Regions:
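Acidic, glycine- and Ser/Thr-rich low-complexity intrinsically disordered tracts
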Residues: 52-55, 263-268, 274, 278-321
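Extracellular beta-strand/beta-solenoid scaffold signature
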Residues: 66-67, 90-97, 113-119, 135-144, ...
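Secretory targeting and sorting signals
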Residues: 1-29
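Right-handed parallel beta-helix
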Residues: 76, 80-85, 102-113, 124-135, ...
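Right-handed parallel beta-helix/beta-spiral solenoid domain characteristic of secreted/periplasmic
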Residues: 30, 34-42, 55-58, 63-64, ...
């Protein structure tokens, strides 16, 4: 059902076509689009505008779903449903592709199958809340091509990177080797990532700044060692905050910083994280492996509020009280 609530009760027109019902008025207002089939969902993704909501009925929606429609900072577009509303993809591609589709909220649904779960390109201010993403060949959620000010929170991501190439990151920010991808100020909050993630739980690329990784639970039991994935979190961007996370089951270290391009991988702050390295089989077995520390030109701060169980130690740089 497609419903336009009336601002003025002057005129009501009801249209029925293809299972969609619309109520309209001379005064424009937000639209709620009720969908229950993949065809209806694809149609809705092409027609929504600022303030509109797409509400998914429980069921399976098979296909690759994409949109270029954009909301605004004051009038967002919402795609919502329960965890029993499942977007499933066969034969590759993205489950949900927000291409230039800024100011969306994606809430509650499940995405599975295909190459990647949720992909954002040049999509500013996207919020992903309470979704489940699993069963993918590659990464779960990817903020790319300067998708700034995004949020992924309260979500569960597991069983990614099933093709074994080490490209199954849970959350991926930016683009490897591309300093023009300024997917800045992405917030990764209160998610459960893993098990079965065939890459870092979170990978923050050079060219991005201000990523916040807070309150997450990491399980690295899916790490493969391919493409150097041997930690829960890999930070190659600048000025990241990594705080109040809990990690178990890694293959070498908990968190790492790297300089892949000159001037990047600097300014990370690690605070109040809890690391369990009790079953870590790696050579380093450090909670925080800081590979690029330079006090003046490329600082990293590891606070004493971080704790580690098992392994060979907290970090390889001086700890800040």
């Amino acid at each position: 059902m497609r419903t336009r609530p009336l601002l003025l009760p002057l005129l009501i027109t009801t249209l029925a076509a293809g299972g969609l019902t619309a109520t309209a008025s001379t005064a424009e207002a937000a639209t709620v689009v009720q969908v229950s089939t993949a065809a209806q969902l694809k149609s809705a993704l092409t027609t929504v505008g600022p303030g509109d909501t797409i509400r998914l009925a429980d069921g399976t929606y098979t296909g690759n779903f994409k949109t270029t429609a954009a909301g605004t900072s004051s009038s967002r577009i919402t795609l919502t449903g329960s965890s029993k509303a499942v977007l499933t993809t066969t034969g590759g591609g993205y489950g949900l592709y927000l291409n230039g589709a800024s100011y969306w909220t994606v809430q509650g649904i499940t995405l599975t199958g295909g190459q990647k779960g949720i992909m954002m390109d040049t999509a500013v201010g996207v919020t992903i809340d309470s979704v489940t993403v699993h069963g993918l060949d590659m990464e779960g959620v990817h903020f790319r091509r300067s998708s700034k000010d995004g949020v992924v929170k309260n979500s569960r991501i597991y069983d990614t990177g099933r093709d074994g190439r080490g490209m199954g990151e849970g959350v991926y920010v930016g683009t490897a080797g591309d300093l023009s991808d300024n997917s800045d100020r992405v917030q990764i909050l209160n998610n459960t990532i893993g098990p079965g993630v065939g890459g870092e739980n979170v990978d923050v690329k050079e060219g991005t700044s201000g990523t916040q990784i807070i309150g997450n639970t990491f399980d690295g039991s899916g790490l493969t060692g391919a493409h150097y994935d041997d930690s829960w979190v890999d930070v190659k961007g600048n000025d990241a905050l990594v705080e109040n996370n809990t990690g178990t089951h890694t293959s070498n270290t908990g968190y790492e910083t790297h300089t892949q391009q000159p001037g990047w991988g600097c300014g990370t702050v690690f605070r109040s994280n809890t690391s369990d390295l009790s079953d870590d089989p790696g050579a380093l077995q450090l909670a925080f492996n800081i590979t690029n520390y330079q006090a003046d030109s490329c600082p990293t701060t590891v606070y004493a509020s971080n704790t580690v169980t098992g392994g060979k130690g907290l970090t390889n740089i001086a700890v800040t009280p």
